[in-house]
Amino acid sequence: MRHLTLAAIALVLTAAAAAQTDDAAPLLSGNLRLQWDQRQASSTGPLAAADKLLPGTAAAPGDGATLTTELHSRGMGWAASATLQQQTQQGVPVRSRARFNELVATHDAGAWQFSAGKKIVAWDVGYAFRPNDVVQQEVRRTLITTLDEGRPVLMAEHFDADSAWSWVWVNPTKERAQTGAQEPALAARVYQRQGGVDWHGFARLGAHTGSSAGGAFAWVASDAVELHASARWLERADSLAISPLATGLVHTDPWAATSLAHPVQALIGGTWTNENQLSVLAEAWWDGTALSDRQWTAWGTRNAVLTRLPGLGAPVAAAAGNLAWQADAFNASSNLRRSNLYLRLTQDLDAWQPALDLLYQPADGGRLLSAALLWKGDRMQAQGGVRTTGGPRNAVLMQLPTRRQAYLAGTWTF
């Protein structure tokens, strides 16, 4: 099946490129990227504790290389993009993946545009977090910017000089019980420009999470200063929670899907840029869909109890397995903590672009620090960087399975 998928993607995009006329602009473009990742496993956290009790319970993240090809093609009334990827990692067989990021048919009818297919629909303002990204629900703050995978949509848009309206039916064929970005939903956005301010309004009706509504603005206050904010209220939100009966060793994973009532998400931020192209971005946000401070405290207490149980005669394998299940908490929301502060410094030095950013979580003092350097040529790019966790030993960020990750990548554009 994997080879058939690869062949189908290559056939569709190659045929599209071959169909162009001699005097037309090339319809096929893309890039080829080779990336090396080096990871240092954390010595703290439930997975580290599980592996210490019973080696092999939770495999440590290994070093590896990834070869990624991104292909783009478009024609009159359609657009397609695809990703082909091969990944090698120490101790893991080579993995090959292929997918269409976008495969969409479009129709322009004056001020209206209609779309059907797999499409990237990215909404909202903000850099590190976007409360109103209700369709795409893109993962933010990745080490390297890659092409996201679109969602199945039926979409209608209306544009004029200073405003736009969008209506989307996302995941129309998926089951109602799907969660997160896979949930079937109806969504709408209105955009209005007034001078230097962009105003946004959003609404969403999920198959099982119900309604949500939000608003955002981005204001270019001067040549040097930009301010933005976004907020969203949700009727319900998908999350994970541990069973209240899980007070000791259990035989099955105690973490299960749950629903949060009436959470709120909000972000405020701004960017300052000087004449030397040095930019400082600062953002603060609240994510009511993340686990609460009380839940994280109970989580840490359970980790400590499970670690001590083998010394009291409990089966080592059972304690290790229960500790490994505790890592489910990392997937409860796109943010680990509800309150977050973010600072990013970048500078554009012609071909060179250094960047430094810090995510800080006031609830426990956890920190996530990233440093990167990018060089851009005409068709070539080279970049490298490192990301590391810091803070008190009991901070949630310090419990993640990877303590430090470094990477090097080279990209050729064609």
Predicted regions and their residues:
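Outer-membrane beta-barrel strand-turn architecture
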Residues: A24, H72-G77, R99, D108-A111, ...
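Residues that define the transmembrane beta-barrel architecture of outer-membrane proteins
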Residues: A59-L67, S96-N101, D148-P152, F159, ...
